[in-house]
């Protein structure tokens, strides 16, 4: 089973994801250039962090038109797993696979830190193997990570148990402390924290490993 890692012009976390999945966990991976439309043979796809297309106009606004994402819509509809990390989460909202939007941080500056997170839902495979009573610690690095949505969308996320992670100490002003959400089916996860930067105990802890392992779990 193989994971596809999408590479956009301006991406800078695709190699990090490759190292965490293949280098640390021994998973088979394949880089997908943004112009590719062939997702055959893939179990899951990762949209990594970075600054796709320089984040001009708005984070993820240009990336959403990449040819690879047309194929991604069909991939998701067939049940394929998709993980969007940071800029990847922004792209998923622009694409309409996840509701809401990511906006400028409340204090209007870039945040780079390791933060405690609360597992808000174990409904999906992504977080089933975590102890919900314990915080996990993952790095964040973003200037536009403040999750925003309407009250009706927030209620829907709550009713569907789709809020996956919450910040314990909200660093960016996200509504309801939201750090990660899933779609109703649970096969799409968007998150601002970086699990790939917490997959090696020597360089940042291992709290992200189980999220990455879920890419290939049934």
Curated annotation (Swiss-Prot):
Gene3D superfamilies: 3.40.50.880. GO terms for cellular component: cytoplasm. Pathway: Purine metabolism; IMP biosynthesis via de novo pathway; 5-amino-1-(5-phospho-D-ribosyl)imidazole from N(2)-formyl-N(1)-(5-phospho-D-ribosyl)glycinamide: step 1/2. It catalyses: N(2)-formyl-N(1)-(5-phospho-beta-D-ribosyl)glycinamide + L-glutamine + ATP + H2O = 2-formamido-N(1)-(5-O-phospho-beta-D-ribosyl)acetamidine + L-glutamate + ADP + phosphate + H(+); L-glutamine + H2O = L-glutamate + NH4(+). SMART domains: GATase_5. The active site is at 86 (nucleophile), 194, 196. Residues 2-218 form the Glutamine amidotransferase type-1 domain. Its EC number is 6.3.5.3, 3.5.1.2. GO terms for biological process: 'de novo' IMP biosynthetic process. Keywords: ATP-binding, Cytoplasm, Glutamine amidotransferase, Hydrolase, Ligase, Nucleotide-binding, Purine biosynthesis. CDD domains: GATase1_FGAR_AT. It is found in: Cytoplasm. Part of the FGAM synthase complex composed of 1 PurL, 1 PurQ and 2 PurS subunits. PANTHER family: PHOSPHORIBOSYLFORMYLGLYCINAMIDINE SYNTHASE SUBUNIT PURQ (PTHR47552:SF1). Part of the phosphoribosylformylglycinamidine synthase complex involved in the purines biosynthetic pathway. Catalyzes the ATP-dependent conversion of formylglycinamide ribonucleotide (FGAR) and glutamine to yield formylglycinamidine ribonucleotide (FGAM) and glutamate. The FGAM synthase complex is composed of three subunits. PurQ produces an ammonia molecule by converting glutamine to glutamate. PurL transfers the ammonia molecule to FGAR to form FGAM in an ATP-dependent manner. NCBIfam families: FGAM_synth_I, PRK03619.1. This is Phosphoribosylformylglycinamidine synthase subunit PurQ. It comes from Prochlorococcus marinus (strain SARG / CCMP1375 / SS120).
């Amino acid at each position: 089973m193989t994971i596809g890692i999408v590479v956009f012009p301006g991406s800078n976390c695709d190699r990090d994801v490759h190292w965490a999945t293949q280098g640390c966990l021994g998973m088979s991976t394949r880089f997908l250039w943004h112009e590719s439309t062939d997702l055959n043979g893939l179990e899951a796809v990762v949209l990594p962090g970075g600054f796709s297309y320089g984040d001009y106009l708005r984070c993820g606004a240009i990336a959403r038109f990449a040819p690879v994402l047309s194929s991604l819509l069909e991939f998701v509809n067939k049940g394929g797993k998709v993980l969007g990390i940071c800029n990847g989460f922004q792209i998923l909202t622009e694409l309409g696979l996840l509701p809401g939007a990511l906006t400028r941080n409340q204090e209007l500056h870039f945040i780079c830190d390791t933060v405690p997170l609360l597992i808000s839902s174990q409904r999906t495979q992504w977080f089933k193997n975590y102890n919900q009573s314990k915080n996990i610690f993952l790095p964040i690095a973003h200037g536009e990570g403040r999750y925003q949505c309407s009250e009706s969308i927030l209620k829907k996320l709550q009713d569907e148990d789709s809020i996956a992670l919450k910040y314990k100490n909200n660093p960016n002003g996200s509504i309801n402390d939201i750090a990660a959400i899933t779609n109703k089916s649970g096969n799409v996860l968007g998150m601002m924290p970086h699990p790939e930067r917490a997959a090696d105990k020597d360089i940042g802890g291992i709290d992200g490993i189980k999220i990455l392992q879920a890419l290939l779990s049934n």
